[in-house]
């Protein structure tokens, strides 16, 4: 007799990593990704922008996290019927590429690059920038992320660069660009300025100890005072950058700040009154003195003598001015102004007609304008400057000052602020419009909109977009080389360049673009030449140009771009609110007056288990490929996307992969176990499951209702960009499916008759697995594919079956038959399945279950049954009473017992009690305890919290309609909770049904109950022996039990029960197939089993 097996032979201990490799091969061999795009109608699209990473390094966990999130929503929108193109992109230009090439070439600095040759250097950058592209493809593919690598865009491609040129000219024509010499964050290690937002990336601020120095400036004239006359009047200024003192040109005070006139010998020192005590030692004070006080406004306009003679004749300099940036805090209340090295300094000095001086070169070294410091790096010059100040008598105090200081995001060297020439976007001109457009964006987490991102927009500054570097898109600006005949030409296309310069442009990079020159049309002498300025674009301008750059807009694909802008969705980590998200917003607003995206997730960062940043140097993380090969990528996906990191918080992940293993064990395995159970028993019975929702069995109706609830919850969650809740819905469903539905339905699967009830059980389980495979396909794409393929597309397997008909005998669950008639429920006759029999789960449509109506009454009742059972089992565990040990009774004390009575036999069987007692007199067993939601209530009533806490402990409160009265206030439902608290003399009690009902287990064990418990233990021992002997679930066996423990009474009373449960007969004197030794009540038992 042949046994037809319709499903794969599935191992309960699956090799998930190997399984995933098979799925990846299936996708590749059948071109499933492309089919998922081609099969969708282009009229309904989900537009997704893939932020371009640098390819000159391997992907890290942050990249994988972002990739998982991108993949989830792309897959989900696909099964929702949307066409989702996923074009990958590469960020190729900028400092990361240049620094890597400098390292590999063994050169450093702009001069060294120029000597090496710009053409050769950029050629090396071009070759090295895609060094890890193949590795990226391996990692991305292995994580089951679908992207289009073949048609990827690169910011170094000529077409992309041309779109950047177009954007620049558009901004220029709109009057949104200007050139200026302004103070900016400056990386002397990279010899380039940085944007303000670049100093906010990747925790660029580091704790740093600097020497802070207090110096005295000698006033040129006396200060009007009643204190008396002094030989000198000196005003004290404090700075953490002594190296800027040689460039001092002014001092700033606060107009409304009080300044003390502090005499010491024949000198009067002027210092903010709030700072006097900090300088008591240096000024020889006892602390008892009183000083004359003047306002800062009285110091305005006073002249002082320059500290050094480098710029002593600089026009309009060495005066005291009022500055609104001078506030009480650190220092002396006096700020020294070096307009070449401070933003506030420059603004104030320019307003007073003081031109800046900047005696520091591109490498952060002093120039010949400071002869005695020439060639010295500015930070190395601090000590020499302090020594000079001491020699001159201008020094008062030096101290170590520890503060957070910005560092270069590429070299980790401390930045300086330095005046450099640059081109700027006038962001301040349209920042209010950006704030308005931001309100059209759905941010996840929500608070990012008006806080992290919104505040940044409100305080946006003009953006420096030019860099004096080499490898990047060149600024399309040509200037006359003769100031007598000034002219500026800005180009926005290759066509414009070719027209004016009369040559074919094949490469827009330096040095080729620099070679384009022509006579200045505005020079009648014909001697001056139009030459391109040397600067290239800030690479953030290029990544912000991604939406149109990838399409070569407006030169090609004009209609396509207009249909694909803005994006429906983007995602990156939270610091990109100062990076990519910001530059997208700036350029989108300036060029199109539209937000660049409509939905945006800002996820958090991944750290090691101690909270440290993941680092090769610290060796504190595992190679992701190792985790994939060990546990599979679905497990890592779930670990990350079910955590708070998707809500912008941190995720701490261990190096050994224990978290991922736990996910495999607690999330992936339960899904697989349900599938394994179905295939094993369906093959054993030669039955096929089918999508069918017409069963009237109460457990079927319940689990199908729970299925639809889960499917709807997943859909609702992913519509709201909430993977956490979606994963919870999956986990919660399989918890009920495995530990309730399958376990309570085993009798139906095990029985020998292939009747309608048995087929309904298979159909219901099949329907659950098939439907969930589709619903969760975006969340666990590979295990979903494996289950779907196994259910839908396996070939029939004809194996030789064991002789004889399956005569599995199992206990009958009569409680369900009773419940069917006791609970009203509505059942539709069929399931509407709006999808074809696709070869891949990722080509299906999301299930709607529109023809099946949830039985909410049954769900509520059955959920209470589960609650009762789980609480009862918890009490058993707490009291160390094993589940196989019967108990006399359970008392259920509730106002809603009628529905529960229909499930009495089920409750008795599940928690192993002999009787269920129903009561409704809760007041005799429990009291209600008030639990305050302190964070919630504290926001509304902070001034009454102490009073409310005292009253809650005393029980001085009253439940009223719509809330709770306490201390003259009415608490809202989310500000408190009433918890049932059993009286202290009651044992074995627990609340259920949202703290509205109570259960009490009778924990007393009689001799009869103990004896029955032993019988159940014996059944378990025999079942384990069957499993260890590798017997089939249908095999009948012989059993012999040898023990010091007297089992005769147990065998006499419970022999039939034991034989029925184990498909066995008691026998002696046979040669066993398997022998096991177990222990019962400290007695050794030997079990012998043999196939009969």
From Swiss-Prot:
GO terms for cellular component: cytoplasm. The keyword Flavoprotein does not apply. Keywords: Aminoacyl-tRNA synthetase, ATP-binding, Cytoplasm, Ligase, Metal-binding, Nucleotide-binding, Protein biosynthesis, Zinc. ATP binds at residue 616. It comes from the Bacteria. PROSITE patterns: AA_TRNA_LIGASE_I (PS00178). Its EC number is 6.1.1.5. Transmembrane segments: none annotated. A motif ('KMSKS' region) lies at residues 613-617. The keyword Protein biosynthesis applies. Pfam families: Anticodon_1, DUF5915, tRNA-synt_1. Its cofactor is Zn(2+). A motif ('HIGH' region) lies at residues 53-63. One of its GO terms (molecular function) is ATP binding. It catalyses: tRNA(Ile) + L-isoleucine + ATP = L-isoleucyl-tRNA(Ile) + AMP + diphosphate. It is an enzyme of class 6 (ligase). IleRS has two distinct active sites: one for aminoacylation and one for editing. The misactivated valine is translocated from the active site to the editing site, which sterically excludes the correctly activated isoleucine. The single editing site contains two valyl binding pockets, one specific for each substrate (Val-AMP or Val-tRNA(Ile)). Belongs to the class-I aminoacyl-tRNA synthetase family. IleS type 2 subfamily. Monomer. HAMAP family: Ile_tRNA_synth_type2. Catalyzes the attachment of isoleucine to tRNA(Ile). As IleRS can inadvertently accommodate and process structurally similar amino acids such as valine, to avoid such errors it has two additional distinct tRNA(Ile)-dependent editing activities. One activity is designated as 'pretransfer' editing and involves the hydrolysis of activated Val-AMP. The other activity is designated 'posttransfer' editing and involves deacylation of mischarged Val-tRNA(Ile). This is Isoleucine--tRNA ligase. It comes from Rickettsia peacockii (strain Rustic).
């Amino acid at each position: 007799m042949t046994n037809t097996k319709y499903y794969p032979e599935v191992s309960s201990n699956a090799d998930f990593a190997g399984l995933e490799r098979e799925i990846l091969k299936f996708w590749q061999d059948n071109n499933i990704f492309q089919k998922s795009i081609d099969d969708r109608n282009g009229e309904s699209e989900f537009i997704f922008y893939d932020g371009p990473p640098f390819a000159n390094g391997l992907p890290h966990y942050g990249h994988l996290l972002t990739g998982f999130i991108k993949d989830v929503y792309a897959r989900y929108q696909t099964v929702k019927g949307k066409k989702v193109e996923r074009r990958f992109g590469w960020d190729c230009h900028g400092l990361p590429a240049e620094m890597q090439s400098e390292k590999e070439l063994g050169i450093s600095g702009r001069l060294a690059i120029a000597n090496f040759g710009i053409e050769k250097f950029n050629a090396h950058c071009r070759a090295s920038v895609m060094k890890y592209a193949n590795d990226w493809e391996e990692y991305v593919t292995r994580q089951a992320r679908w992207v289009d690598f073949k048609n990827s865009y690169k910011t170094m491609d000529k077409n992309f660069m041309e779109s950047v040129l177009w954007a620049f000219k558009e901004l220029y024509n709109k009057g949104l660009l200007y050139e200026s010499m302004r103070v900016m964050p400056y990386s002397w290690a990279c010899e380039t300025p940085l944007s303000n937002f670049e100093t906010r990336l990747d925790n660029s601020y580091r704790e740093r100890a600097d020497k802070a120095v207090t110096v005295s400036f000698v006033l040129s004239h006396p200060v009007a005072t009643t204190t008396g006359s002094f030989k000198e009047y000196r005003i004290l200024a404090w700075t953490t950058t002594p190296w800027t003192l040689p460039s001092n040109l002014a001092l700033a005070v606060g107009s409304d700040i009080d300044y003390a006139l502090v005499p010491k010998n024949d000198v009067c020192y002027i210092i903010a009154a709030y700072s006097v005590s900090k300088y008591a030692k240096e000024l020889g004070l006892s602390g008892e003195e009183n000083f004359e006080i003047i306002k800062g406004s009285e110091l305005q306009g006073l002249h002082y003598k320059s500290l050094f003679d480098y710029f002593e004749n600089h026009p309009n300099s060495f005066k005291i001015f009022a500055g609104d940036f001078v506030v009480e805090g650190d220092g002396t209340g006096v700020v020294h102004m070096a307009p070449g090295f401070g933003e506030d300094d420059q603004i104030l000095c320019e307003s007073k007609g003081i031109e800046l001086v900047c005696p520091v070169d591109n490498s952060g070294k002093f120039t010949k304008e400071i002869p005695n410091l020439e060639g010295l790096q500015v930070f190395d010059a601090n000590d020499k400057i302090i020594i000079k100040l001491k020699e001159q008598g201008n020094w008062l105090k030096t101290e170590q000052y520890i503060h957070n200081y910005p560092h270069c995001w590429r070299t980790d060297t401390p930045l300086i602020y330095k005046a450099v020439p640059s081109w700027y976007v006038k962001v301040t001109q349209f920042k209010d419009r950006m704030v308005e457009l931001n309100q059209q964006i759905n941010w996840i987490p929500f608070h990012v909109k008006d806080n992290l991102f919104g505040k940044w927009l409100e305080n946006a500054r003009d953006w420096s977009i030019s860099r004096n570097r080499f490898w990047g898109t060149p600024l399309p600006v040509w200037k006359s080389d003769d100031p007598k005949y000034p002219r500026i030409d800005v180009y926005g296309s290759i066509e414009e360049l070719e027209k004016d310069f009369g040559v074919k442009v094949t490469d827009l990079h330096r040095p080729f673009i620099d070679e384009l020159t022509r006579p200045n049309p505005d020079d009648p002498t014909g001697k001056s030449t139009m030459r391109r300025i040397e600067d290239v674009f800030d690479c953030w301008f290029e990544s912000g140009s991604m939406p149109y750059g990838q399409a070569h807009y407006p030169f090609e694909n004009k209609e396509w771009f207009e249909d694909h802008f803005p994006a429906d969705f983007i995602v990156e980590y939270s610091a990109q609110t100062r990076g990519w998200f910001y530059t997208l917003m700036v350029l989108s607003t300036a060029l199109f007056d539209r937000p660049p995206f409509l939905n945006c997730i800002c996820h958090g960062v991944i750290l090691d288990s101690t909270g440290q940043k993941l680092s090769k140097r610290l060796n504190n993380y595992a190679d992701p490929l190792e985790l994939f090969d060990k546990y599979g990528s679905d497990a890592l996906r779930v670990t990350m996307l079910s955590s708070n990191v998707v809500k912008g918080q941190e995720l701490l992940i261990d190096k050994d992969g224990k978290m991922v293993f736990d996910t495999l064990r607690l999330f992936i395995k339960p899904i697989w176990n349900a599938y394994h159970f179905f295939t094993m028993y369906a093959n054993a019975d030669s039955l096929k499951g089918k999508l069918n929702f017409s069963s009237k069995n109460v457990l079927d109706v319940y689990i199908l209702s729970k299925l639809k609830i889960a499917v709807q919850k997943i859909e609702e969650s992913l519509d709201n960009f909430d993977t956490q809740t979606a994963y919870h819905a999956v986990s919660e469903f399989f918890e009920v499916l495995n530990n309730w539905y399958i376990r309570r339905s085993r009798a139906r699967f095990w029985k020998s008759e292939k009747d309608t009830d048995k087929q309904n059980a298979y159909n219901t389980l099949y329907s659950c697995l098939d439907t969930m495979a589709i619903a969760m396909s975006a969340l666990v794409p590979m295990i979903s594919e494996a289950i779907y393929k196994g259910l839908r597309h396996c070939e029939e397997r004809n194996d030789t079956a064991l002789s004889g008909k399956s005569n599995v005998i199992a206990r009958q669950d009569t409680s369900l038959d009773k419940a069917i008639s006791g609970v009203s429920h509505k059942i539709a006759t069929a399931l509407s399945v709006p999808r074809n029999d696709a070869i891949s789960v990722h080509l299906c449509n999301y299930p709607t279950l529109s023809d099946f109506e949830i039985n909410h009454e049954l769900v509520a009742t059955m959920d209470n049954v589960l609650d009762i059972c789980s609480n009862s089992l918890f009490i058993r565990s707490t009291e160390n009473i094993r589940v196989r040990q019967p108990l006399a009774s359970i008392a259920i004390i509730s106002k809603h017992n009628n529905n529960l009575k229909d499930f009495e036999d089920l409750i008795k069987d599940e928690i192993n009690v002999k009787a269920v007692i129903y009561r409704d007199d809760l007041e005799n067993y429990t009291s209600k305890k008030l639990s305050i939601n302190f964070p919630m209530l504290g926001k509304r009533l902070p001034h009454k919290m102490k009073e409310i806490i005292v009253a809650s402990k005393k029980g001085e409160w009253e439940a009223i309609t719509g809330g709770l009265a306490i201390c003259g206030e009415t608490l809202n439902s989310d500000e408190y909770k009433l918890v049932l608290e059993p009286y202290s003399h009651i044992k074995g009690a627990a609340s259920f049904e949202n703290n509205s009902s109570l259960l009490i287990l009778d924990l007393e064990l009689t001799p009869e109950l103990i004896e029955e418990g032993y019988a159940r233990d014996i059944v378990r021992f025999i079942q384990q022996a069957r499993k260890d002997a590798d017997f089939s679930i249908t095999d009948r066996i012989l059993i012999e039990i040898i023990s010091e423990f007297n089992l005769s009474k147990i065998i006499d009373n419970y022999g039939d029960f034991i034989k029925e449960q184990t498909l066995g007969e008691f026998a002696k004197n046979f040669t066993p197939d398997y022998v096991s030794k177990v222990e019962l009540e400290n007695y050794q038992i030997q079990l012998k089993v043999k196939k009969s």
